[in-house]
């Protein structure tokens, strides 16, 4: 965008900077004053001006369009924050509230001011149209080529031959058939059970003589499904079959995603049924199976009956996104092979000390930062855009410009918009609505606590040990920085501080968890107790790892 604005200004001021054109214009004016201008010259001049206008037209329209998109986004954000004189907004949009003005104020007041979906592209798709930004993308590709070449050269020198084995990838994604059938069981149960429970409750609520007890019974069944079936079975499979780390991550992340999806489906539709029952409506607003099925695959955690849709599917774009996901996967593999594995395998035999820890942290910053960028690009951009394109899902704002954040609060809002929306509307705003706006700090604390616990749960199950480094960083340092480095910080120096602290934090995470992984591999216990799973092995292991 910056490059296009500069180009536009340069072209607009080209006539002022070019002395030859100024002289030509002066001669033309002199000729016109003397009455000797010819019709050919006049026509040529008009054609030249028309050509220049046509040349500037696409850039001008594109710039105006970008500013208009920003204006519309800001307008929607502001309109969603209005109290509207005490009247609740609907789940879908302001226009639907005007059309179907039947929501009761006491059902879902503040939380109903929910997310409004509009058709928009992902930010990186727009930025990659600027050559200066796309060059950064090319730099990462060049770095991947260097990693591949260095690995091949080192293997050839050490082994005397080219070693084209991906043992680390094969190990990480092992026992994949178990992952497939477990995922199918999770998906089909999420498709059938919440929909059946909600449909049964919705059709019987208005007919029940004890609607509160009727609702509590169905709510209890739904809670049993969320915690007992969807919450327990995938975790049991992961531990019982001792799946490798990457296979575990697939199941655990899908488990969390489906739990959040099912909650959103019920959370958005229950108030509609309550409102219809209060108005004694003859129709029960129950979504169709197709609407729920589409939502389960859509790249959003906020349920709507319909979303903005694109007119066509660009299958070439889909293939490119999946290709980039696999490229990022191999990128991470080579980072582990070239930067991480040698670092932790070659730690000397010495007691755990501050010196060892500090050296490990600072040596882990570079691979940690690279994996941060790659995970963001692979999942939040490529993976979500691929599914959005296949489903013709119009709203592609899965993230914002988090790299420009000058505060931690802004970073948390822009890094992962998909998860942030769910936490904001279903945890933060629901708590404020249920209790009081005076409990705003408590609601914010609850959001941080839930996010920290879920992140630590995923890591503990996937790595087979409990080492609450991420929980401490997120719950204590992250929350403290959220208040200290807040939205009032606008100067560029704060962006540098946010970036530096985030990079250091990722170095700490990679160092601690990798050290603990290798320590447990090199110092196994014959009969481990429960305390052995939660006590860090790094502090006691004295073997060379």
Swiss-Prot record:
Pfam families: MBOAT (PF03062). One of its GO terms (biological process) is cholesterol metabolic process. The modification Phosphoserine is found at residue 7. Cholesterol binds at residue 132. Residues 9-18 have a biased composition (Polar residues). Disulfide bonds join 523-541. The keyword Membrane applies. GO terms for cellular component: endoplasmic reticulum; endoplasmic reticulum membrane; membrane. Its main location: endoplasmic reticulum. It catalyses: a sterol + a long-chain fatty acyl-CoA = a long-chain 3-hydroxysterol ester + CoA; cholesterol + an acyl-CoA = a cholesterol ester + CoA; cholesterol + (9Z)-octadecenoyl-CoA = cholesteryl (9Z-octadecenoate) + CoA; cholesterol + hexadecanoyl-CoA = cholesteryl hexadecanoate + CoA. It is found in: Endoplasmic reticulum membrane. A motif (FYXDWWN motif) lies at residues 398-404. Belongs to the membrane-bound acyltransferase family. Sterol o-acyltransferase subfamily. This is Sterol O-acyltransferase 1. It comes from Rattus norvegicus (Rat). The lineage of its organism: Eukaryota, Metazoa, Chordata, Craniata, Vertebrata. The gene is Soat1.
């Amino acid at each position: 965008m910056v490059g296009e604005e500069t180009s536009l200004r340069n072209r607009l001021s080209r006539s002022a900077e070019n002395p030859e054109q100024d002289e030509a214009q002066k001669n033309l004016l002199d000729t016109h004053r003397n009455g000797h201008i010819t019709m050919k010259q006049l026509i040529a001049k008009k054609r030249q001006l028309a050509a220049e206008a046509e040349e500037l037209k696409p850039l001008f329209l594109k710039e105006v369009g970008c500013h208009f998109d920003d204006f519309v986004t800001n307008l929607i954000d502001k309109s969603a924050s209005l109290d509207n004189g005490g009247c609740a907004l609907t789940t879908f949009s302001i226009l639907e509230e005007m059309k179907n003005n039947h929501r009761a104020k006491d059902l879902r007041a503040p939380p109903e001011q929910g997310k409004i979906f509009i058709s928009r592209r992902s930010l990186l798709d727009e930025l990659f149209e600027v050559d200066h930004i796309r060059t950064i993308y090319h730099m990462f590709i060049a770095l991947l080529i260097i990693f591949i070449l260095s690995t091949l050269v080192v293997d050839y020198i050490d082994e005397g031959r080219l070693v084209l084995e991906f043992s680390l990838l094969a190990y990480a994604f092992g026992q994949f058939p178990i992952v497939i059938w477990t995922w199918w069981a999770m998906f089909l149960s999420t498709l059938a059970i919440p929909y059946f429970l909600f449909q049964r409750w919705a059709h019987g609520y208005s007919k029940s003589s004890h609607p509160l007890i009727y609702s509590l019974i169905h709510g209890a069944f739904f809670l049993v499904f969320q915690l007992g079936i969807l919450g327990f079975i995938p975790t049991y499979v992961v531990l019982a079959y001792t799946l490798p780390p990457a296979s575990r991550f697939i199941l655990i992340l899908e488990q969390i995603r489906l739990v959040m999806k099912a909650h959103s489906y019920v959370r958005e539709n229950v108030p509609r049924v309550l409102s219809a029952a209060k108005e004694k409506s003859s129709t029960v607003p129950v979504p169709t199976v197709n609407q729920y099925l589409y939502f389960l695959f859509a790249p959003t955690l906020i349920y709507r009956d319909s979303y903005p849709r694109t007119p066509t599917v660009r299958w070439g774009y889909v293939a490119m996104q999946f290709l980039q996901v696999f490229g990022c996967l191999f990128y991470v593999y080579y980072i582990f092979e070239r930067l991480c594995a040698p670092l932790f395998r070659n730690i000397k035999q010495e007691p755990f000390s501050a010196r060892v820890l500090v050296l490990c942290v600072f040596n882990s910053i570079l691979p940690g930062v690279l994996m941060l960028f790659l995970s963001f690009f692979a999942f939040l951009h490529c993976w979500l855009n691929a599914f959005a394109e296949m489903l013709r899902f119009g709203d592609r704002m899965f993230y914002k410009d988090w790299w420009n954040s000058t505060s931690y609060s802004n970073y948390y809002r822009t890094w992962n918009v998909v998860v942030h929306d769910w936490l904001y509307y279903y945890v933060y705003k629901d708590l404020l609505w249920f209790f009081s706006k005076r409990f705003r700090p408590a609601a914010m604390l609850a959001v941080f606590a839930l996010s920290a616990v879920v992140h630590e749960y995923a890591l503990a199950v996937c790595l087979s040990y409990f080492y609450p480094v991420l929980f401490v960083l997120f719950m204590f340092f992250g929350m403290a920085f959220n208040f200290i480095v807040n939205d009032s910080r606008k100067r560029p120096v704060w962006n540098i501080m946010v970036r530096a602290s985030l990079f250091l934090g990722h170095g700490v995470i990679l160092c601690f968890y990798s050290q603990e992984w290798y320590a447990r591999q090199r110092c196994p216990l014959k009969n481990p107790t429960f305390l052995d799973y939660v006590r860090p092995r790094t502090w006691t292991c004295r073997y060379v790892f």
